[in-house]
Regions:
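N-terminal secretory signal peptides that target proteins for export/translocation
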Residues: 1-9
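Bacterial N-terminal signal peptides
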Residues: 12-22
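Structural preference for beta-rich elements and adjacent junctions enriched in aromatics
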Residues: 27-429, 437-438, 450-451
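Short secondary-structure boundary/capping segments
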Residues: 134, 238, 323-328, 458, ...
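Outer-membrane beta-barrel transmembrane domain signature of Gram-negative proteins
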Residues: 240-261, 409-469, 587-641, 652, ...
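Extended, hydrophobic alpha-helical segments in both membrane/secreted and soluble proteins
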Residues: 270, 291-297, 305, 311, ...
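Alpha-helix capping and helix-loop boundary segments enriched in small/acidic/polar residues
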Residues: 284-285, 328, 380, 410-418, ...
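Exposed, low-structure sequence patches enriched in small/polar residues
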Residues: 385, 466, 470-473, 477-765
C-alpha cells in the first residue's frame, strides 16, 4: 500500500517565556538550630566523619554477649550511648549546602543475627510532626520521613532502600541500575516513639533479609530526612542536587560488621487459602467454595545468590489494578503486582524499557522483552493456574544473573493450554556505574504441537556522575530479535538512549526501530513496523532567595514515529510553557501539545465511531495542571485539557481529592471526564474511584476500593484486610465484587464476586 507523505512540516511551536518572579528583598534566614535540653541518648560523642578520599564513614558497634535490644523506640539500652552517631546532615532543599535546621543522629549496632539502627529526629516544634500514613509500603509524599539506603556489596550500583515516618510506617525497595522495585517486601521490624525532643526510631534488620559478602566488613550507607512542614530535605552525604539518595555511588561507608550469619539461608513460606466465589455473568450463579495450599521456598546457595521455588502459586491477596481510560490506538500498560515476580525483578530489567515518554504524549511506546504479566494472566487480566515456578537471582563474581522458569496448567474452562516460560538474564558490571548484558526468553505450549517462541537480546549502559565535574550522564543501546514458527525475516528491534538527568538542565534523546514481525512472546510492545526519534530538553532554574518560588521549569520534547520507509506516522511536540514549584509545596504548570497523526489502519475510538484509514490529523491541545501540598489535611490536584482532537474537539477534566481525617484514616476521590466531539460522532467517558482506608496500626489495615468507568461499564469493589502478625507472617481477607451495567434491565447486575481468606507463615533457618 502506498503511504502518503505529509508535506512540509508546519510545527506550530508555541513560545512563551514567563520569567515573572520578583527576587526577595532579603534572603530568608534558616531556622536556628537548638539542642533539646532533654535527651534519651546523650550527644557526647563527635559524629562520624570523613574517611579515606573524603567519604563520610561511621562504625557499627557489636553488642556484647550479655546485651540485647528491645524494640520499643526508647533507645535506652547502654550500647546506644556508646555508639558514635552519624550526624551533621546537610540540606538538599530549600537551602542547598547549609546545615539542617533540625538535627538528626543515626547509630548502628549489631549482633550475630541482625543489624540495629537507633535514629533520633530532633524537632524544635515536636508537636508539629506530620505522619498520616501507617500502612506498609504506602508513599510518604505527605509526611515527615526518615530514609536510608544500604549497599551491601559496596558496588555503587545496587542496594536496599528503607523509609519510616513518625507514625511507624515501614516501606522498602530494591535498588538496581535501571531503577527500583518498590514492591519488594523485606522481613524487618521497627518501633517509633514521639516525645518532647522529636521522634525516635529503633530498627532491626535481620541479616537473613539481606544479601551480602560476609568477607567484607564495609557497606555503603546513606540517610535522608524530610521535615515536611518546612519543605526541608537533608542528607548525611551527597547533598548536591544532582546526586540523590538512591544513587548508591554517593553513599557513605559503615564499617565493623563482621562475624555475622545469614543462617542456613533457607526460608519456608507455606500458605493456606479458602475461597468462595460465584460468576453469574458467566452462567455460574451459586457460590462454590474451595480450599488449597501451597508453599514458597527461598534459599541462598551463596551469600550473593537467592533461589526461589513456588508450588501451587496463588495471588489472592493482591490489590486490584487501577482503571484507566484509553483514547489512544495503543495498549494500556498495567504494572506487575504479584510477589513471586516482583521479588528480584530488577535482575531481569532490560535497557529497552527506558519509559522516556513525556506526559504520555508520545503514545507510550514501551518495548519490554520480558513482561511477567504475560505469565499466568489472561489477556483480560484474569488469573490462570500456575503449577510451579523457580527463580535464581543475585551476583556471581562481576555478573548480575537472573534465571526464571514457570509452568502454567491447562484450563478446562477456557481456551488455554499449559505453557512453559523460561527467562535468562546476565549483566556484567564494567567501570564504576555501567554494564553490558544479554537476555533470552522462551515460551512454548506443551500440547499444541507448535514450536516455541524465542527472544534474544543484548544491551549496554554506560553512566557517570562526574561528567563536566558533577553532572550525571547516561548512554545505552540495545538490540532484540524474536523467533517464532513460520516467521524468518524482519524480526528485530534495536535502539539507543542518551540521558542527561540533572537538576538545572535535563536532556534526553531516544531512538528505536521495531520491525514488522518483531514479537517478544513474553514481552510488551504497543505496535510494530516503526522508527521512533524522541529528543527532550528542560531548563529548571532555582530563583535565588525567592520568598515563594523554589524552582521553575521550561522545556519541550518532540516524539516522532515513522514507518520503516521514514514516512511520518505521528509527531508530537509537547511544550512546558511554565511549571512552578513553590516553597509551600504547591505546584502548577501550563503546557501545550501539537500532534500530527496519520492512521495506517482504521481506529475504533469508541463504540460505533471509527476514524477512517489514511486520514491525516493535525491538532493542538492545551493543559493546565495544579496540586496543593500533600501535607495538608485536604490535598487537591487537577488537570484541565482542551483543544482539537482528531476531526473535532476534546475536553478532559481530572480531579483528585485526598482527605486525611487523622493519621491512619483516609478518603481518596478521583474523577476523570472526557467530552469528545468528532465529525464521525460524539461520546463521553467517565471514570470514578473511591478509596477508603482505615489503618489501625503499622501492622493492620483495611482498604476499600470502588471503581467505575463507562468504557467497561463495570463497577468494581474490593475490600482488603491485612494483618501483619509479625513481619513475614500475614493474614489476608479479601472480598471482590463486580457489577455490569445491564441496559436491558436499566440496572447493574452482579457479574462475579469472590471472598478469599489467606494465611502465610514464614519459617527461617
Amino acid at each position: 500500500m502506498h503511504i502518503r507523505r505529509p508535506g512540509v512540516w508546519r510545527l506550530r511551536l508555541i513560545v512563551l517565556v514567563l520569567l515573572t518572579y520578583v527576587p526577595a528583598a532579603t534572603a530568608q534566614k534558616s531556622a536556628s538550630e537548638t539542642q533539646p535540653a532533654e535527651q534519651q541518648v546523650a550527644s557526647t560523642h563527635e559524629s562520624s566523619g570523613a574517611g579515606e578520599g573524603g567519604r563520610r564513614t561511621m562504625t557499627a558497634l557489636r553488642l556484647a554477649d550479655d546485651e540485647s535490644i528491645v524494640l520499643d523506640g526508647r533507645l535506652d539500652e547502654p550500647i546506644w550511648s556508646r555508639a558514635v552517631p552519624a550526624a551533621g546532615f546537610i540540606q538538599i532543599d530549600p537551602f542547598n549546602g547549609r546545615p539542617a535546621t533540625e538535627p538528626t543522629e543515626v547509630r548502628i549496632v549489631f549482633d550475630g543475627d541482625a543489624l540495629y539502627m537507633g535514629v533520633i529526629c530532633y524537632d524544635s516544634e515536636p508537636d508539629r510532626w506530620i505522619g498520616y500514613q501507617m500502612r506498609r509500603d504506602e508513599g510518604l509524599g505527605s509526611d515527615d520521613r526518615f530514609m536510608w539506603t544500604i549497599d551491601t556489596f559496596l558496588d555503587g550500583r545496587t542496594g536496599y532502600f528503607f523509609e519510616m515516618n513518625p507514625s511507624g510506617l515501614m516501606a522498602d525497595a530494591l535498588l538496581g541500575m535501571n531503577g527500583q522495585n518498590r514492591e519488594w517486601d523485606g522481613i524487618w521490624n521497627a518501633r517509633v516513639r514521639r516525645s518532647e525532643i522529636g521522634w525516635t526510631l529503633e530498627i532491626k534488620i535481620p541479616f537473613r533479609t539481606l544479601n551480602f559478602n560476609p568477607e567484607s566488613d564495609g557497606w555503603g550507607i546513606n540517610f535522608q530526612r524530610t521535615v515536611r512542614r518546612k519543605g526541608e530535605d537533608s542528607i548525611w552525604t551527597g547533598w548536591a542536587r544532582n546526586q540523590e539518595l538512591r544513587r548508591m555511588n554517593n553513599a557513605g561507608l559503615v564499617t565493623g560488621i563482621r562475624d555475622v550469619t545469614q543462617g542456613r539461608g533457607l526460608d519456608i513460606k507455606p500458605y493456606g487459602l479458602v475461597t468462595s466465589e460465584a460468576s453469574p455473568g458467566r452462567g455460574s450463579t451459586a457460590m462454590t467454595g474451595s480450599a488449597s495450599a501451597g508453599v514458597d521456598l527461598f534459599y541462598n546457595p551463596t551469600p550473593l545468590l537467592r533461589a526461589n521455588v513456588t508450588v501451587n502459586t496463588d495471588f489472592a491477596q493482591i490489590d486490584v489494578d487501577q482503571r484507566q481510560v484509553n483514547l489512544t490506538r495503543y495498549s494500556l500498560f498495567f504494572p506487575e503486582r504479584r510477589d513471586f515476580f516482583l521479588d528480584g525483578a530488577i535482575f531481569f530489567d532490560f535497557g529497552s524499557d527506558t519509559d522516556g515518554d513525556r506526559q504520555g504524549q508520545g503514545g507510550n511506546q514501551r518495548i519490554i522483552p520480558f513482561f511477567s504479566r504475560r505469565i499466568g494472566l489472561s489477556a483480560g487480566g484474569e488469573p490462570e493456574r500456575i503449577d510451579f515456578g523457580t527463580k535464581l537471582t543475585g551476583q556471581v563474581g562481576a555478573q548480575d544473573v537472573g534465571l526464571l522458569h514457570v509452568r502454567t496448567g491447562d484450563n478446562d474452562g477456557a481456551d488455554t493450554v499449559g505453557e512453559d516460560f523460561t527467562v535468562a538474564r546476565i549483566k556484567r558490571r564494567v567501570l564504576e556505574q555501567s554494564y553490558i548484558g544479554a537476555l533470552y526468553t522462551r515460551r512454548g505450549a506443551r500440547t499444541s504441537g507448535i514450536g516455541p517462541d524465542h527472544t534474544v537480546g543484548a544491551d549496554a549502559r554506560f553512566a557517570t556522575s562526574t561528567f563536566l565535574g558533577d553532572q550525571n550522564l547516561e548512554a545505552g543501546g540495545w538490540v532484540l530479535s524474536s523467533s517464532r514458527p513460520g516467521v524468518s525475516s524482519d524480526r528485530s528491534a534495536f535502539g539507543a538512549t542518551v540521558n542527561f538527568p540533572n537538576d538545572r538542565w535535563i536532556a534526553r534523546f531516544d531512538a528505536a526501530e521495531v520491525q514488522e514481525h518483531f514479537d517478544p512472546a513474553i514481552g510488551f510492545v504497543t505496535r510494530s513496523s516503526y522508527r521512533r526519534y524522541a529528543p527532550t530538553l528542560d531548563f529548571a532554574p532555582r530563583p535565588s532567595n525567592h520568598p515563594y518560588i523554589r524552582q521553575l521549569t521550561f522545556g519541550g520534547s518532540v516524539d516522532m514515529l515513522t514507518d520503516l520507509e521514514n514516512d511520518l506516522l505521528t509527531r508530537t511536540v509537547d511544550l512546558t510553557l511554565i511549571q512552578v514549584n513553590l516553597h509551600s509545596q504547591d505546584n502548577f504548570s501550563v503546557a501545550a501539545t501539537n500532534r500530527r497523526e496519520w492512521l495506517d489502519e482504521p481506529f475504533g475510538i469508541s463504540q460505533g465511531i471509527t476514524l477512517p484509514l489514511g486520514a491525516v490529523y493535525d491538532f493542538t491541545r492545551y493543559r493546565v495542571w495544579g496540586q496543593t501540598a500533600n501535607r495538608r489535611i485536604l490535598a487537591v490536584s487537577g488537570r484541565l485539557e482542551i483543544g482539537d482532537f482528531f476531526s473535532g474537539t476534546r475536553t478532559e477534566r481530572v480531579l483528585n481529592l485526598n482527605l486525611r481525617l487523622r493519621p491512619g484514616l483516609f478518603l481518596y476521590l478521583t474523577g476523570q471526564w472526557n467530552n469528545v466531539r468528532l465529525r464521525e460522532g460524539s461520546f463521553t467517558t467517565q471514570l470514578y474511584r473511591i478509596v477508603g482506608e482505615t489503618q489501625f496500626s503499622p501492622f493492620m489495615s483495611l482498604v476499600h476500593n470502588i471503581q467505575y468507568d463507562t468504557q467497561s461499564a463495570v463497577v468494581g469493589w474490593q475490600s482488603r484486610f491485612r494483618w501483619i502478625v509479625t513481619p513475614g507472617n500475614d493474614v489476608y481477607l479479601v472480598y471482590t465484587h463486580n457489577w455490569l451495567d445491564d441496559p436491558l434491565r436499566n440496572r447493574f447486575s452482579t457479574f462475579d464476586r469472590r471472598f478469599a481468606s489467606k494465611v502465610l507463615y514464614t519459617y527461617r533457618f
